[in-house]
């Protein structure tokens, strides 16, 4: 046991000041107003300014900022920005909650045996060949390689300089939504448009600066189901989606337009045309409030839920003045498939490594997305290549890159207009494929009207096996990811792949499904709660050896293990692991 370090006693006045600071969660100067040396005064000045701004924040009626106000936080959480956020919340949060309730009701029908299908009441939208989405902005017409990642300063500069055509700055699956990550990410993105993003790493002393041709910036806010607990409006936490979107749009939209670009977004986790309609209403309100022309906001919708796959035309229709394309978010889509059929034993999947694009329900989904988008003049974006360089094994690295190359060649042949990568070293690999097979900016002219995808094509189970190795890999990956997420990291390298929340969701969902239906693995072992708990204990010893005992002890593995266990053994399927994980992050407990 480490010896505890004695803390110096505080004077009564200091205790009182500390208590007040904790109570109000605002940044206060460390010193009083007595005269000090000019050097100390210059250091104190921005702190005093932050305190004055924080006091202004605290006086805004109905709005409470519960997170600390660190350096430059008040610049993002300005009074005008908070008024804008409050307006978004008061106008749209009720509708958001109604839509989340509608999700729950729809899931009850699926649990009772109903199968997803194309809505008969919107057949006229799907059958009408005359409508198209609005013309695509010039800097979105060639999106052959997009790099994605979290919003820390180093990642932003490296992504902008990566050679990719576009960079998706992610507040969602690749971001752990700590208060610091969210606000400092907003500071970093604002600095990009103010020309102040260049910096020197304090540890390595390496200089980072944006090059002459940076990637076009696109931002992904959180999904409709997540909240931002550190900001409440009229006593309710604001939607994470409105928080992320609102702050970025408020601070950057006009600067983006002035630079010849625009406020561009990726929208995650939509499940219906009604949820798309809500985003469209948010866009109209935001543009009108800031005096920005209608249609300035442009969005790409990730089709990463099974219900949304049956409403692609309808989503494009609802957002036709603001949408530019759709993306095949394959990892979350697999998770959504498991969740949709949580109570249906006819849809138990094989090892997730065997659920591949081009086959089963993913094959139908991929074909339908391209056909639907191109028919409406929108882009079809391919999925993520999560591989990262394997520095100590050139043969394994070459094999990994060959796998990426083959996947991107499939995407081009299928008609996709661009793709995603998670690491800068994969940009030239993907770019070479698209340059070779798609010399023009895009292939939206490949309409593929001959393609017909029916309901059963979107529900076709992949053939494959269930293995003990698959169970154990799911355990190791899922727990390691949750541990990192709880410590503030949302994009995590695990076994030579850059993992985000989607992989953790698949991992725990597949184990839950196999336990519930007593899946029999190759070799005859039946997946039971007892088998899972034994494997969990064994695999955590493997993880401890892999990461090292010291790193394991410094992590949050006990909490991650408990959460992973409870999600996997829960009687009812928990819709999103990030909801109890966020509660755990904030309070130290969940449930």
PLM region descriptions:
Residues 1-54:
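Arg/Lys-rich, intrinsically disordered low-complexity tails that mediate electrostatic binding
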Residues 39-40, 52-591:
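Expand to "…catalyze enediolate/carbanion chemistry for C-C bond making/breaking, isomerization
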């Amino acid at each position: 046991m480490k010896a505890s370090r004695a803390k110096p006693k505080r004077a009564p006045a200091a205790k009182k000041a500390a208590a007040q600071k904790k109570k109000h969660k605002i940044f206060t100067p460390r010193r009083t107003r007595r005269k000090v040396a000019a050097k100390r005064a210059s250091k104190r000045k921005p702190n005093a300014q932050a305190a004055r701004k924080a006091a202004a924040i605290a006086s805004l009626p109905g709005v409470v900022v519960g997170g600390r106000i660190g350096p430059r936080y008040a610049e993002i959480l300005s009074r005008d920005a908070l008024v804008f956020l409050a307006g978004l919340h008061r106008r749209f949060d009720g509708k958001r909650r109604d839509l989340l309730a509608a999700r729950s009701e729809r899931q009850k029908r699926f649990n009772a045996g109903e199968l997803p299908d194309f809505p008969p009441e919107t057949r006229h939208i799907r059958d009408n060949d005359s409508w198209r989405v609005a013309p695509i902005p010039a800097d979105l017409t060639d999106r052959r390689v997009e790099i994605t990642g979290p919003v820390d300063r180093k990642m932003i500069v490296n992504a902008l300089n990566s050679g990719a055509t576009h960079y998706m700055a992610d507040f969602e699956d690749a971001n752990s939504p700590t208060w610091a990550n969210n606000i400092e990410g907003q500071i970093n993105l604002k600095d990009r448009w103010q020309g102040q993003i260049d910096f020197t790493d304090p540890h390595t002393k390496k200089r980072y600066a944006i090059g002459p041709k940076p990637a076009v910036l696109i931002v992904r806010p959180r999904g409709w189901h997540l909240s931002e607990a550190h900001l409440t409006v009229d006593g309710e936490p604001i939607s994470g989606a409105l928080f992320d979107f609102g702050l970025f749009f408020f601070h950057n939209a006009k600067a983006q337009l002035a630079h010849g670009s625009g406020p561009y977004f990726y929208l995650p986790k939509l499940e219906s045309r009604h949820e798309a309609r809500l985003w469209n209403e948010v866009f109209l309100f935001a543009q009108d409030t800031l005096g920005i022309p209608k249609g300035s906001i442009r969005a790409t919708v990730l089709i990463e839920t099974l219900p949304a796959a049956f409403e692609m035309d309808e989503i494009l229709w609802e957002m036709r003045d603001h949408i530019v394309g759709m993306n095949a978010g394959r990892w979350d889509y697999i998770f959504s498939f498991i969740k949709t059929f949580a109570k249906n034993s006819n849809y138990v999947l094989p090892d997730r490594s065997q659920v591949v694009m081009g086959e089963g329900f993913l094959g139908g989904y991929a074909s339908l997305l391209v056909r639907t988008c191109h028919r409406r003049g929108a882009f079809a974006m391919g999925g993520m290549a999560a591989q990262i360089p394997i520095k100590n094994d050139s043969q394994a690295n070459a094999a990994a890159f060959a796998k990426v190359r083959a996947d991107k060649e499939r995407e081009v042949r299928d008609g996709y207009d661009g793709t995603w990568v998670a690491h800068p070293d994969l940009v030239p690999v993907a770019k070479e494929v698209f340059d070779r097979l798609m010399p023009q900016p895009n292939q939206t002219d490949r309409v593929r009207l001959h393609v017909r995808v029916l309901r059963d094509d979107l529900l076709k189970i992949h053939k494959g096996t269930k293995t003990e190795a698959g169970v154990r890999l799911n355990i190791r990956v899922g727990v390691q990811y949750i541990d990192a997420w709880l410590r503030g990291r949302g994009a995590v390298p695990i076994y030579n792949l850059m993992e985000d929340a989607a992989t953790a969701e698949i991992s725990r969902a597949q184990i839950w499904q196999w336990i519930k239906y007593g899946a029999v693995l190759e070799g005859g072992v039946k997946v039971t709660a007892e088998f899972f708990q034994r494997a969990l204990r064994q695999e955590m010893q493997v993880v401890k050896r892999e990461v090292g005992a010291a790193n394991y002890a410094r992590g949050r593995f006990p909490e991650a293990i408990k959460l992973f266990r409870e999600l996997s053994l829960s009687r009812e399927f928990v819709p999103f692991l990030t909801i109890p994980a966020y509660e755990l992050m904030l309070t130290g407990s969940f449930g």
